[in-house]
Curated annotation (Swiss-Prot):
Tissue: Expressed in the olfactory bulb (at protein level). Expressed in the deep cortical layers, dentate gyrus, reticular thalamic nucleus, mammillary bodies, pons, and cerebellum of the adult.
SUPFAM superfamilies, per the entry: Periplasmic binding protein-like I (SSF53822), Periplasmic binding protein-like II (SSF53850)
Species assigned in the record: Rattus norvegicus (Rat)
Quaternary organization: Homotetramer, and heterotetramer with GRIK4 or GRIK5. Can form functional heteromeric receptors with GRIK2. Interacts with PRKCABP. Interacts with NETO2.
Membrane topology annotation: Multi-pass membrane protein
Subcellular location: Cell membrane; Postsynaptic cell membrane
Keywords assigned by UniProt, alphabetized: Cell membrane, Disulfide bond, Glycoprotein, Ion channel, Ion transport, Isopeptide bond, Ligand-gated ion channel, Membrane, Phosphoprotein, Postsynaptic cell membrane, Receptor, Signal, Synapse, Transmembrane, Transmembrane helix, Transport, Ubl conjugation
Membrane-side (Extracellular) residue stretches: 32-563, 658-820
Official protein name in the record: Glutamate receptor ionotropic, kainate 3
Cross-link annotation Glycyl lysine isopeptide (Lys-Gly) (interchain with G-Cter in SUMO1), location: 887
Amino acid sequence: MTAPWRRLRSLVWEYWAGFLVCAFWIPDSRGMPHVIRIGGIFEYADGPNAQVMNAEEHAFRFSANIINRNRTLLPNTTLTYDIQRIHFHDSFEATKKACDQLALGVVAIFGPSQGSCTNAVQSICNALEVPHIQLRWKHHPLDNKDTFYVNLYPDYASLSHAILDLVQSLKWRSATVVYDDSTGLIRLQELIMAPSRYNIRLKIRQLPIDSDDSRPLLKEMKRGREFRIIFDCSHTMAAQILKQAMAMGMMTEYYHFIFTTLDLYALDLEPYRYSGVNLTGFRILNVDNAHVSAIVEKWSMERLQAAPRAESGLLDGVMMTDAALLYDAVHIVSVCYQRASQMTVNSLQCHRHKPWRFGGRFMNFIKEAQWEGLTGRIVFNKTSGLRTDFDLDIISLKEDGLEKVGVWSPADGLNITEVAKGRGPNVTDSLTNRSLIVTTLLEEPFVMFRKSDRTLYGNDRFEGYCIDLLKELAHILGFSYEIRLVEDGKYGAQDDKGQWNGMVKELIDHKADLAVAPLTITHVREKAIDFSKPFMTLGVSILYRKPNGTNPSVFSFLNPLSPDIWMYVLLAYLGVSCVLFVIARFSPYEWYDAHPCNPGSEVVENNFTLLNSFWFGMGSLMQQGSELMPKALSTRIIGGIWWFFTLIIISSYTANLAAFLTVERMESPIDSADDLAKQTKIEYGAVKDGATMTFFKKSKISTFEKMWAFMSSKPSALVKNNEEGIQRTLTADYALLMESTTIEYITQRNCNLTQIGGLIDSKGYGIGTPMGSPYRDKITIAILQLQEEDKLHIMKEKWWRGSGCPEEENKEASALGIQKIGGIFIVLAAGLVLSVLVAVGEFIYKLRKTAEREQRSFCSTVADEIRFSLTCQRRLKHKPQPPMMVKTDAVINMHTFNDRRLPGKDSMSCSTSLAPVFP
């Protein structure tokens, strides 16, 4: 039984082998190539065009035909396909069609693209382990256990990151995100979470549900001044939005639209090329590749030969992103099947739940595949099956159409490239031949009506610094302009409700393109409009009328010396007189014999009593004599130093007195903003709704807060314009707070006005533009060019230079202070110290001689002399007792007794002489 059994088993094996070859392989003996089958499930909508082949179905056939014609890719294999059509959102029909294709033995199923249908087909493919190829964005949960699929559409997290990088590159501080359905919030989650990490404010809006009319939403965004908008919608909806935005007047250079659809390049953008709108999008189709361009051209030729399509806003014959992704998907599956060896395909039944035994192996081949297709580099994540590595072109609308301006990739991020040479720039990249509306107001010398004998029209009506500046900018940038005066005549301020007025409001409402005027750049205005770099720097100061000359005081003779110096001179006078009195009493050489001819006189005299000492000091200070002459060296030192001191003081006083008598002092009641804040007699204010008023209103400095409280409490303190404020300053006791440049211009032409104090703050005048205006940077560069060429200074000299007022000398002679003549007090003090030391020496020396002569102890002699010297009322005392004297016939010359010589006498002689007699 063994042999028959073996023979039977061999026959059965040969039978099944032959059956498999006949079923799945084309016999080589007949010369037929190997055949593989793929399945495609595509949706169609109800209506008259329901049976018309859509782009995806055509791409499915197109790619299969390309592969079959190109034998280098599948040399021994023929690719066949099965196409099934289903209704949108019909997941049951999608399940049935998928089972039918699996029964035919397909190696992979492509589509469908709609969410619920995709999930149904994916579940079947995962159960039977057949690769499912997805081509549309689809949210894949983190806990998704389906592994038998790949998605060629870029990963939504990467796309969201690309949008965020683009927004950051554009330096947007605010934007509006408009999404079509709830899946848009998932696709844009990276951008929506940006405010928590980046300095950007987002406003989220949703397009109308079940309606293509977006005009109410566009009107609301236009009213809200939302100029930077990100649209997450299909290309069909994008075409409708652009058409409706054009009708709403929103296709201007102030708007910037970003569309997340990868089919923006396929839209017919011809009507918007010269509108100035900033239109940015993404493209994954690699049109720069020559091979891709050839395939796209073949596709276009076939599509143009097809039946004409209804108006859809698309370019004729253009290859959409879905078609390109499907083309790449078919090629990847074909290449992977060619690389797989000894892999057979059998019919699969959905109700039997028996998977394809080669499905896992084939799925791994697909996930590990790397391919350069129409959409660039294709690499899948081996775990999730998502396409996370790809390149996105950043495209922008220019005059010549859409142009590639950058590239984004998950690895390298965003790289903005320069505009290629020879390609047309965006209409807003150049101001050449553009006509701009310029808003301004009358303000001398910036903008004034031109004086002329004939009637002037248009821009010729105006002249001034800003007009010359505008002409220079127009010459550099090549634009033309129309000047319009602002309706309310105001610069622009924000009320309590947040509403703006003046030129700022006209820029916000896009009634003007530029505001060329002395418009101050402030933090509050920067939130509403954009500014160029300042063309003039300045600050707030005080305009006040010049003070009249004041009558001198009856005590103005005291002004040459400061009060401190007068006090110090008085103290020095008192001190020197007292020291002179004390030293004169202590010094023995200051005592003299009042009667030198009377040898019996026992009394010596001292002229420097307390009153005489004061009289001596007063006579020296007044440059008059006192007939009191010091005799001792110590008292002469005091006298000499005091005379030197009085010489310097009197000379300085005389010199400074001349300045005070010849120069009339001009005194102003205020010298600074602090002086204004501390008083209420002089009323002060600023131009209403101007930058100066806003500065005081927003300031947190206590002085300025106090000033604003004063101005706001008195409505009359604020003036309508500068002319009213100047007239009020001239006629009333009023100070006008205004820009220093205007004060400089006014004081050059009105000599009765002057600037009080320095600058309170520092700021600049800039040219205002609407928020997000493409002209701002161009204007800034032109201003910097004018500054480098010194033309801004030349223009200012032209308009600020007037007849001028005679320059005033410094009319305030400063009183001499201790810093200037303090040294003379030091010399005086040193002289006093020296005289005291000399007096002490004289005192000790003389008393020692007296003690020896009278044969007394030195200490007792000193005590007696000190006791007498401290008796201030007495000017006479007994002279020291000399030795016993005898008469002689000799005549004694009194030149040897200098200490007894009377003042004014050179010598004395007596008829008798005395000689010492010793016992």
